[in-house]
Regions:
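Short beta-strand elements in bilobed, periplasmic/extracellular small-molecule ligand-binding domains
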Residues: 1-10
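Short acidic active-site motifs
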Residues: 11, 15
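Flexible loop/turn connectors
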Residues: 17-120
């Protein structure tokens, strides 16, 4: 389901309730970020749906709260701490003309932080 650009805990809770109310069978939620996933966990618990026994949930971005929520959220760690300084450095180099790099794809490694919301 689409949340638009509202990627908050509240949006995750509302969208999950809409999905439950739709009657469409599902057994997992892959959320765009951890906040949406935490909202989903809240709504699943409020509806008596057991995680991970009846429903598995995974987020993306490994925010600090994910480890402390009950149950602790399985998430993807995108390892992107380096991206902002790299982007700023490339932009400043281009502005002052010291080094103009050709456009390129920059890739990163991501990995699963398995916690209690999936059966991995």
């Amino acid at each position: 389901m689409n949340t638009g650009q509202d990627w908050t805990i509240g949006s995750g809770a509302r969208i999950t309730q809409q999905l439950i109310d739709s009657g469409i069978p599902f057994d997992g939620i892959v959320a765009f970020n951890d906040q949406l996933a935490l909202g989903a966990l809240f709504t699943l618990a409020a509806n008596g749906i057991s995680v991970p026994d009846q429903m598995q949930v995974i987020g993306f971005d490994n925010i600090e709260e994910a480890a402390y929520f009950q149950p602790p959220l399985t998430t993807m760690d995108s390892c992107l701490d380096w991206i902002a300084p790299t982007a700023v450095s490339r932009i400043l180099d281009r502005i002052d003309g010291t080094r103009v790099l050709e456009p390129s794809y920059i890739t990163t490694q991501s990995h699963v932080i398995a916690r209690a919301t999936t059966r991995v």
